[in-house]
């Protein structure tokens, strides 16, 4: 797991770091040592406005910014420095001290005596419990169990039409009574199903 923190979104932390003047550092450019006093601008918006208004237009350089965007202005202000005009180095004169190999000719050394230590602990706990309850479906509840029809065969005459049989064999069938009772019961079941629907 990696944790990345954008310092530009934490003005309260950075304000205590860049409020004071940092120690002077020594930069090396093309073999020349340059002493420079760097002063970080306060991230407070009001202080920055006073700083910009106190400077004359010709003294405002690329390192100064008048951006009103909080994130952009703070990001620029945290890196903005005031330098002396005499501390500049001409690139034309720097070519004279370049080594013949042209390897490692431009070197910049920068040291910052202040830093940020961030310690973050992330604890997470996820518990999932599921209960599976078996419930009878509506079909099972609505299903009705009808009694079983039992009938004995007999030889009694029952009134049956010839249309009930293809060849008129029902008149001589010994299961006429059973067939008739079954047919009446099937009609009752059909009517009951229609009412339920």
Curated annotation (Swiss-Prot):
Query: Which residue intervals make up region (Disordered)?
Result: 17-37, 53-72, 85-104, 129-166
Q: Which organism is it from?
A: Rotavirus A (strain RVA/Pig/United States/OSU/1977/G5P9[7])
Q: Which domain of life, per UniProt?
A: Viruses
Renumbered to this chain, the Polar residues biased-composition regions fall at: 91-104
Location in or out of the cell: Host cytoplasm
Q: State the protein's name.
A: Non-structural protein 5
Report biased composition (Low complexity) as residue ranges. 17-30
Q: How is it modified after translation?
A: O-glycosylated.
Which residue windows does the record flag with biased composition (Acidic residues)? 152-165
């Amino acid at each position: 797991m990696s944790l990345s923190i954008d310092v530009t979104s934490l003005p309260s932390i950075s304000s205590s770091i860049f409020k004071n003047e940092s120690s002077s550092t020594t930069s090396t450019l093309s073999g020349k040592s340059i002493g420079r006093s760097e002063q970080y601008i306060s991230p407070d918006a009001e202080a920055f406005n006073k700083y910009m208004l106190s400077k004359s237009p010709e003294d405002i350089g690329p390192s100064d910014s008048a951006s009103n965007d909080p994130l952009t202005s703070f990001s620029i202000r945290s890196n903005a420095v005031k330098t002396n005009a005499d501390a500049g180095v001409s690139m034309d004169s720097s070519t004279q001290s370049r080594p013949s190999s042209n390897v490692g000719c431009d070197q910049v050394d920068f040291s910052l005596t202040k830093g940020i230590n961030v310690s973050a602990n992330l604890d997470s706990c996820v518990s999932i419990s599921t209960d599976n309850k078996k419930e009878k479906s509506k079909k099972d509840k609505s299903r009705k169990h009808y009694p079983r029809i039992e009938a004995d065969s007999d030889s009694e005459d029952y009134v049956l039409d010839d249309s009930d049989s293809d060849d008129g064999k029902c008149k001589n069938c010994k299961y006429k009574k059973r067939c008739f009772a079954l047919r009446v019961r099937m009609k009752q079941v059909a009517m009951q199903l229609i009412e339920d629907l």
